[in-house]
């Protein structure tokens, strides 16, 4: 089933050069290309070449590499396209807006504050932060992740 999904994946087809893409960066592990929608001028996607459905599945080493490329490309986009800033984001699952199920990160150059709306609704009066904190805090796991990250970024 997973193999079938990958054969239908538009990003895998771009990686395999089965369909064209405006590729702005490529190495052994990842690729970056212009998003056809161009939500903003220069809208770029960065993807790992290995198929992962979303950020929850990607291994830490691949994620670290992809993020380094995102940072470098975002800087290049700001400089070369005279963007005033960028949004860097990923969507995970349909409820969050994911439409292509191959992990990817959007680099959205920003020129004018009105060209794209990304808004956060304030629910602070409806949420018990202590309750949420207790549910997601895991000190031991965070310590292990920190040690692993220190090794990754050396």
Question: Whereabouts are the PLM-identified features?
Answer:
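HIT superfamily nucleotide-processing domains
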Residues: 1-154
């Amino acid at each position: 089933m997973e193999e079938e999904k990958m054969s239908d994946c538009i990003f895998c087809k771009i990686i395999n050069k089965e369909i064209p893409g405006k590729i702005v960066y490529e190495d052994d592990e990842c690729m970056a290309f212009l998003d056809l929608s161009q939500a903003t001028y220069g809208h770029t996607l960065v993807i790992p070449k290995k198929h992962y459905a979303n950020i929850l599945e990607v291994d830490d080493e691949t994620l670290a590499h992809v993020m380094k490329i995102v940072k470098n490309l975002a800087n290049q986009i700001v400089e070369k396209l005279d963007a005033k800033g960028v949004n860097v984001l990923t969507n995970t699952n349909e409820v969050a807006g994911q439409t292509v199920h191959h992990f990817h990160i959007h680099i959205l150059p920003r020129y004018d504050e009105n060209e794209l709306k990304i808004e956060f609704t304030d629910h602070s009066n409806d949420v018990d932060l202590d309750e949420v904190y207790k549910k997601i805090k895991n000190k031991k796991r965070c310590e292990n992740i920190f040690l692993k990250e220190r090794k990754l970024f050396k």
